[in-house]
């Protein structure tokens, strides 16, 4: 029983990111001019596509955008499965992001900060 616990704790200490981040794109609303004035369509969103690169399920990934804002993706992310999510954002000037904290289902945490 000690070996699985010890191994899972070491996953949280690894310096390599435990996810493979394939896409991290910020989308902004578009404003169009029409006869009635400007119309805004859409909203600020973060499109992330990633997969768990470990053998342990992940329960939460914190993404930090290049303007310092953060957004979490919470769920059960199984090893090797591609996750493709669009997450809502507040107004932002960000153009990119990185995964900075990953929480595993067993409670271990990887911190890339």
Residue ranges and their predicted role:
Residues 1-12:
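Hydrophobic alpha-helical targeting segments used for export or membrane insertion
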Residues 17, 70, 74, 78-79, ...:
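Terminal connector regions
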Residues 17-62:
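Short, surface-exposed binding/anchoring microloops in extracellular/periplasmic proteins
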């Amino acid at each position: 029983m000690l070996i699985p616990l010890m191994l899972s704790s070491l996953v949280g200490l690894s310096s390599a990111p435990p996810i493979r981040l394939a896409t991290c794109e910020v989308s902004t609303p578009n404003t169009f001019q029409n006869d009635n004035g400007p119309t805004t369509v859409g909203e600020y969103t973060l499109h992330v596509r990633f997969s768990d690169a470990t053998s342990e399920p992940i329960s939460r990934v914190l993404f930090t955008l290049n303007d310092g804002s953060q957004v979490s993706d919470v769920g059960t992310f199984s090893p090797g499965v591609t996750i493709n999510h669009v997450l809502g954002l507040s107004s932002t000037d960000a153009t990119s992001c990185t995964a900075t904290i990953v929480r595993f289902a067993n409670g271990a945490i990887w911190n890339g900060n």
